[in-house]
């Protein structure tokens, strides 16, 4: 058998923080990319001390190290899309902005991670938040804030669908090309997509599950993968929402806090690949005896 001529899948880059429980951050991004038949590479912008119960502390990667990570990847592999998550501080946000300017990537999805959902720890300093709003928004194809992040970036108090739409429009006014305001923390599982021309309200079944750790990271990564695979924006967002909904439904508990999503629910019940089968015991050759010396 030879694999020399297998086609290379789309190569996607995540720039984010590392979660040791692997429910959120880079681990969630890479699992999502793989589940969408893409190959993921990663630049670690921060290490976090956390579990599903919350973030205890963060350790931001020095800007020079993050720049070196990005340069090493860009010099070696053809990155077609970038997903941005936790950056930690303004210095790292500036490194990412410079990298995007040099890279000319087809798709950039910005998940403006500011605070941890569990525990509320700060994941981006105040100067970084301002830089994100002033500089990174306009470098992204899609921005995916949750309610709290949209409120922080726009100053709009969001209590209903109309306020979600207003926040999405304001973020586009500030430079984003398209915005998805995630309503997962509201009473109904409704998201709002604004592409600069029209508003699309995305309804969905609210899954009764506590296993939602990393759902925001997963959603942004799924959008990235769908865009990189050639889907138009509206279809990419709808497919990403459907994927996350099912992954939450199939999620499982691993510890004392909210469990992770099942990023690979699609393959758990698939038949084995063609050509793979069980070999009867009598058809196997006995192990060779070691050679005497």
Residues covered by each model-derived region:
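Short pre-catalytic strand/loop immediately N-terminal to key active-site residues, enriched for Gly-Thr
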Residues: 15-21, 199-213
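Conserved phosphate/ATP/ADP-binding segment of small-molecule kinases
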Residues: 124-199
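Charged C-terminal helix
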Residues: 9, 57-60, 234-293
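Phosphate-handling active-site elements
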Residues: 37-41, 199-200, 226-240
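Glycine- and other small-residue-rich loops at beta-strand/loop junctions that grip anionic moieties
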Residues: 18, 84-85, 121, 182, ...
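Acidic-glycine-rich active-site phosphate/pyrophosphate-binding loop
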Residues: 3-9, 25, 187-202
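Conserved N-terminal subdomain of the carbohydrate kinase-like
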Residues: 3-14, 26, 30-122, 267-270, ...
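Short, small-residue alpha-helix embedded
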Residues: 32, 151-152, 209-233
